[in-house]
From Swiss-Prot:
Family from the record: Belongs to the Gfo/Idh/MocA family.
Gene that specifies this protein: iolG
Keyword annotations of the record: NAD, Oxidoreductase
GO BP of this protein: inositol catabolic process
Catalytic activity: myo-inositol + NAD(+) = scyllo-inosose + NADH + H(+)
Name of the molecule in the record: Inositol 2-dehydrogenase
Length: 341
């Protein structure tokens, strides 16, 4: 689709991330109109739809995808629904922005890859927003500059203040760890070879079905070794860390907050309390680029193959916890459709 008019978007999912994307599409991003909204909770869909003059609430996600007034689809519903909605969008030959994970299993992601290959073109962009975060872009630029030499090790941390007591370990791995699995592939421009996940002493605040925290060791195809801390009930805030160790030095994300308080013999820095604020600029950038791409009839950014490779790694992490061994996670050669020119 190449057009001078606004892209008519159908939104599936009006929960936390869907509502935030709706706000973004209505107040930040130019060239987009949300014309249809679906959510399992009709009242929530209605609340989001009222932000847009002509948006309709549609009771069925597949009907939204097939609606002739919808040019492109944003899938921000619960993770287990992603695969079916994305496949329906591909079948309808409509561009689709899907929040991570692309599907809850690597097998599901691969079915999406095969559907795109059957059409001979891309339709899917996956919401790996960290690739658009200014701090991570700076980190990658430092790597590419060669200033620290060849990378050898990396230390990452993904910390949430709290999560629902009903969250399960497999869901935490699929929904949260998937960010780091995509991030390391993107930072190092190579695939993951194997994954080892370790669960130690449990945080007393974790629900009964959640191992928290987790430590995940990732070996890249280039033998770079990455350790990832996943702490989901850390209490103090939403905190993302990354440091890369090279042959000549290190490079790391700086503090997220420019303010330092020095009071009564103590030095304090405020910490972000939510992913919405920490990655607001990244969400703006990724959706702006997607809308621009759709209006110009092209697809770029994180692909279905990226979604597959990252979820293959999270599947491996879950299997590693069960088997207490390292698990292979190499996805194979990138199909021609997904190779960058």
């Amino acid at each position: 689709m190449a057009t001078d008019r606004s892209v008519r978007i159908g939104l599936i999912g009006a929960g936390a991330i869907g509502e935030d994307h709706a706000r973004r599409l209505s107040t930040v991003i130019r060239g987009a109109d949300v014309v249809a909204v679906h959510d399992v909770d009709p009242s929530r869909a209605k609340t989001v739809a009222t932000r847009f003059r002509d948006a309709r609430v549609i009771p069925d996600g597949n009907s939204l995808i097939g609606d002739p007034d919808v040019d492109a689809v944003v899938v921000a519903s619960a993770a287990p629904t992603h695969e079916a909605y994305v496949l329906a969008a591909i079948a309808a030959r409509k561009p689709v922005f899907c929040e991570k994970p692309l599907a809850t299993t690597a097998a599901g992601c691969l079915r999406i890859v095969e559907a795109e290959k059957a059409h001979g073109r891309r339709f899917v962009r996956v919401g790996f927003m960290r690739r658009f975060d200014p701090a991570y872009l700076g980190l990658k630029a430092e790597l590419r500059s060669g200033a620290i030499g060849h990378p050898l090790l990396a230390h990452l941390a993904h910390r949430n203040p709290a999560v629902p007591s009903t969250l399960r370990t497999t869901d935490a791995i699929a929904d949260s760890l998937v960010h780091e699995m995509d991030l390391v592939r993107w930072l190092f421009d190579t695939e993951i070879r194997e994954v080892r996940a370790v669960a130690g002493r449990r945080n007393a605040k974790a629900g009964p079905d959640l191992h928290d925290p987790l430590l995940v060791l990732v070996r890249m195809a280039t033998d770079v070794v990455v350790d990832v801390e996943l702490s989901l009930n850390i209490g103090y805030g939403y905190h993302i860390r990354a440091e890369i160790v090279g042959e000549n030095g290190t490079v790391a994300l700086a503090s997220e907050q420019p303010i330092v308080r020095r009071i009564s013999g103590e030095e304090r820095r405020p910490v972000a309390q939510h992913w919405k604020t920490r990655f607001a600029a990244a969400y703006d950038a990724e959706l702006s680029e997607w809308v621009r791409d759709v209006s110009q009839g092209r697809v770029s950014g994180p692909s279905a193959w990226d979604g597959y490779a990252a979820t293959l790694a999270t599947d491996a992490a879950a299997e590693s916890l069960r088997s207490d061994t390292a698990v292979a996670a190499f996805p194979g050669d990138v199909p021609t459709l997904y190779r960058e020119p």
